[in-house]
UniProtKB/Swiss-Prot annotation:
List of residues binding Mg(2+): D517, D521
Function: Part of the high-affinity ATP-driven potassium transport (or Kdp) system, which catalyzes the hydrolysis of ATP coupled with the electrogenic transport of potassium into the cytoplasm. This subunit is responsible for energy coupling to the transport system and for the release of the potassium ions to the cytoplasm.
Key words, A-Z: ATP-binding, Cell membrane, Ion transport, Magnesium, Membrane, Metal-binding, Nucleotide-binding, Phosphoprotein, Potassium, Potassium transport, Translocase, Transmembrane, Transmembrane helix, Transport
UniProt lineage: Bacteria, Bacillati, Bacillota, Clostridia, Thermoanaerobacterales
Protein name (Swiss-Prot/TrEMBL): Potassium-transporting ATPase ATP-binding subunit
SUPFAM superfamilies on file: Calcium ATPase, transduction domain A, Calcium ATPase, transmembrane domain M, HAD-like
Gene this chain is encoded by: kdpB
Organism of provenance: Caldanaerobacter subterraneus subsp. tengcongensis (strain DSM 15242 / JCM 11007 / NBRC 100824 / MB4)
């Protein structure tokens, strides 16, 4: 189930908190981490000084009001950038607070060295301690079940109310502190010290108190800093050039021009985009260990998918009853029903349901005096011995052949053909027997999840290769792979095959994603560029992965890849828009500033703004308000459609590149007209 944790972006608490943090973040010790906006803040301080002490900055008394306006607009620009980041952080803090409420101090039943039980606080537990949990107990700490089996309510962590079964010795042996034991009794070995639990790590991650920038974000910041330095040099050289041609440019105008030219839009939104990307993953109940993991998901070239539970439901369900040896379909259906009346497995229930849908009906007293024959690994058959002496069985082809041989019966000529046909279709054949006679075959089909073929088609359009991993024989694997639409499959796979496939793909320069839940998956999860572990799996798997799915839904790897691509697209789209904005603003305001002194420049003044002062103020106002206008896109992400990289590039250039060129001309002109009509400037 792909369920989102819904926390409103624009709730009163989050917005008020973001406004407060916007002022707190004005501290230069914090602002220097965002070099572009730090330059704007320094510029704000200089124009403030020019407003208070105009003579020291060569300003005339008439320019004090203008300097004050420039200072105010620059100040608001910095606040808007801080607000965008604080708003994104606010969502994470709200989610962290929700999780923190689930972390309660509980009492634990600690098993001491002599075997006695001592009641202690959960905060006193250490790694390696053994605790007992019974029905109704809150599990005091993360650990591994070493004895017993129990139903666990994990709704405090996952939000999912249905209990899950956890037991010792398997891939579903790990338990999380804060969850509740619904039934039975288990013995748990604590695997973490206080403050290092899975819930503690979740809180730190979603709160983002010490969010590390991803490599792509660092690289983009380096580019933005380089552009900022270039424009600082450009503006600094403009002053002596203007003086040479007898054009006077004030300090406030120089700073305003610099702020309009440097990439303030993406500089103000960059952190918000990264935080929001992590948040979008969290809303799908997936915890990413770093922003790097989310970004890596966006660059994935290959996805490894387990067949069972990911591509198929994993429950083989009855699809048909096929008669052999001249028997009728009705006869096979009836005895298939009889053989499964006491079979409580999903397969057995599906046989009963299908038989009844096809009109078969068992007598009300059929089970009276009947002996139930349970399925076992040795016999690989199950059924009933009826009170009238009739023996009814269903089982695997090989074991039924042995059984019929022992009973002195014969195998129908068409049985091999029907069994092979079912195997080629990717199904599992179960042969139905009455006494020493084969009646027919039950076709069990591992049903492919709805929509998987379409999703694989979308992944293929994005240039992502899909590889199905299965323990099935090659014929069955090939059939399911073709039906599902995966690009490649690995049949009869062993645990080491996964890591070998990952290394093979990585050797070809491809980034690989995979899901896993068992201890034997841990090496492959660690090797993969994106490893998504199931929360229901072992602690080893969760520690090896760089993402954990709280819903334990392996198909969610496809959503994670989509979110990663959306993050990269959003950053790229807004960067394109920002740089296109800067180019447009340059041609919009620079000619307006110097055309009065140099009439030859008027040919470049396509905007025909009312005055040089209005040109500067209009550009600054546009530069400030474009940040909050784009906050919803930064938070939500640009609309993502599966397509090739070239198609995405052309689409973004058209929408955000061309849009970034046009928007400043329209916006600045409108603001200029408003200023002129209101103030008569």
């Amino acid at each position: 189930m792909k369920r989102k944790r819904e926390i409103k972006t624009w709730s009163r608490e989050i917005v008020v908190g973001a406004i407060k943090n916007s002022f707190i973040k004005l501290n230069p010790l914090y602002m220097y981490k965002n070099p572009v906006m730090f330059v704007v803040e320094v510029g704000t301080f200089i124009t403030l000084l020019a407003t208070i002490f105009p003579t020291y900055f060569g300003s005339t008394p008439d320019e004090v009001g203008y300097n004050a306006l420039v200072t105010f607009i620059l100040f608001v620009t910095v606040l808007f950038a801080n607000f965008a980041e604080s708003l994104a952080e606010g969502r994470g803090k709200a989610q962290a607070e929700t999780l923190r409420k689930t972390k309660k101090e509980t009492m634990a039943k600690l098993v001491q060295s002599d075997g006695s039980i001592k009641i202690v606080k959960s905060s006193e537990l250490k790694k390696g301690d053994i605790v007992i949990c019974e029905a109704g107990d809150i599990i005091p700490a993360d650990g591994e079940i070493i004895e017993g089996l129990a139903a666990i309510d994990e709704s405090a962590i996952t939000g999912e109310s249905a209990p899950v079964i956890k037991e010792a010795g398997g891939d579903f042996s790990s338990v999380t502190g804060g969850t509740k034991v619904i039934s039975d009794r288990i013995k748990i070995r604590v695997t973490v010290d206080e403050g290092e639990s899975f819930l503690d790590r979740m809180i730190k991650l979603v709160e983002g108190a010490k969010r590390q920038k991803s490599p792509n974000e660092i690289a983009l910041t380096t580019v933005l800093v380089s552009l900022t330095i270039i424009f600082i040099v450009v503006v600094m050289t403009l002053y002596p050039m203007a003086k040479f041609v007898h054009v006077r440019i004030s300090a406030a105008t120089m700073i305003a021009l610099l702020v309009c030219l440097i990439p303030t839009t993406i500089g103000g939104l960059l952190s918000a985009i990264g935080i929001a990307g992590m948040d979008r993953v969290t809303r799908f109940n997936v915890i990413a260990m770093s922003g790097k993991a989310v970004e890596a998901a966006g660059d994935i070239d290959t996805i490894l998918l387990d067949k069972t539970g990911t591509i198929t439901f994993g429950n083989r369900l009855a699809a048909d009853f096929i008669p052999v040896g001249g028997h009728s379909k009705e006869e096979v259906t009836y005895y298939a029903l009889i053989s499964s009346l006491k079979d409580l497995t999903p397969e057995g229930r599906s046989i009963v349901d299908l038989a009844r849908k096809m009109g078969a009906k068992a007598p009300d007293d059929i089970l009276e005096g009947a002996e139930v024959v349970e399925f076992s690994a040795e016999t690989r058959m199950s059924g009933l011995n009826l009170k009238d002496g009739t023996i009814v069985r269903k089982g695997s082809y090989d074991k039924v052949k042995e059984y019929i041989g022992e009973k002195g019966g014969s195998i129908p000529d068409d049985l091999d053909k029907e069994v092979e046909k079912i195997s080629l279709l990717g199904g599992t054949p179960l042969v139905v027997v009455k006494d020493n006679e084969v009646l027919g075959v039950i076709y069990l089909k591992d049903t492919i999840k709805p929509g998987m073929k379409e999703r694989f088609k979308q992944l293929r359009a994005m240039g992502i290769k899909t590889i199905m991993i299965t323990g099935d024989n090659p014929l069955t694997a090939k059939t399911i792979a073709e039906e599902a639409g995966v690009d490649e499959f690995i049949a009869e796979s062993k645990p080491e095959d996964k890591i070998n496939v990952i290394k093979r793909e990585q050797a070809q320069g491809r980034l690989v994603a995979m899901t896993g839940d068992g201890t034997n998956d841990a090496p492959a999860l660690a090797q993969a560029d994106v490893g998504l572990a199931m929360n229901s799996g072992t602690m080893a798997a969760k520690e090896a992965a760089n993402m954990v799915d709280l819903d334990s839904d392996p198909t969610k790897i496809i959503e994670v890849v989509g979110i990663g691509k959306q993050l990269l697209m959003t950053r790229g789209a807004l960067t394109t828009f920002s740089i296109a904005n800067d180019v447009a603003k340059y041609f919009a305001i620079l000619p307006a500033i110097i055309s009065e002194t140099l009439p030859a420049i008027k040919v470049l003044d396509v905007m025909k703004l009312s005055s040089p002062t209005n040109a500067i103020l209009s550009a600054l106002i546009y530069n400030a308000i474009i940040i909050p206008i784009l906050i919803p896109i930064a938070m939500r992400g640009v609309k993502y459609r599966p397509m090739s990289a070239n198609a995405l590039l052309m689409r973004n250039l058209l929408i955000y590149g061309l849009g970034g060129l046009i928007a400043p001309f329209v916006g600045i002109k409108l603001i200029d007209m408003i200023i002129s009509s209101i103030f008569g400037m």
